Regions:
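Intrinsically disordered, low-complexity polar/acidic regions
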Residues: 1-168
Length: 168
């Protein structure tokens, strides 16, 4: 509960951007471009698809590497081979919910390649499966008014709490 959808983010080398866009436009049957939150050099991490598309269309084509928080989480997932959640963000498809969302990112590697070292994983990286999470939707069915129930969500960065949300 609370996932606004499930999608795939493709790692696109700068020199592969034109071919990727042509394929994306064929698949989506729409004139979709790569959008950035802030200009940056290097590979693009582009939201290629997400379901359900109806409530997430605004996210398709977004280069998540163009925002430091999203890029850092994606890079950590790629390096470690583990699922990583971003720090609090504002979803493109839910702009009125400022800093109330997260992306859960899990790296996807091309088959048949070694994944022993960080360098192996970086070379084999195809992209990430991901789920955008809006905290209000995640907690919608949780009754925080029960006296025996306490909930604390903390964002930890380098072992330090950066954001705390508590109830109970």
């Amino acid at each position: 509960p609370g996932a606004r959808g499930f999608g795939f983010i493709r790692r696109v080398p700068v020199n592969g951007e034109s071919a990727f866009l042509a394929q994306l436009r064929r698949d989506a049957s729409a004139d979709i471009g790569i959008r950035q939150l802030e200009p940056h050099g290097g590979d693009r991490y582009v939201i290629q698809n997400i379901e359900p598309i109806e409530r997430n269309l605004a996210a398709v084509g977004l280069d998540i590497a163009s925002e430091a928080n999203r890029r850092a989480a994606a890079d950590e997932a790629a390096r470690t081979g583990r699922a990583v959640i971003t720090r609090a963000i504002t979803l493109i498809q839910a702009p009125s919910q400022s800093q109330r969302s997260f992306l859960l990112l899990l790296p996807v590697y091309r088959p048949g390649l070694p994944l022993v070292s960080r360098q192996d994983r970086q070379a084999a990286l195809a992209g990430w499966t991901y789920a955008p999470l809006l905290i209000d939707e995640v907690l919608r069915d949780v009754d925080l008014n029960q006296p025996q129930f306490a909930l604390a969500l903390d964002e930890l960065t380098d072992g330090r709490a950066m954001l705390g949300i508590g109830a109970g």
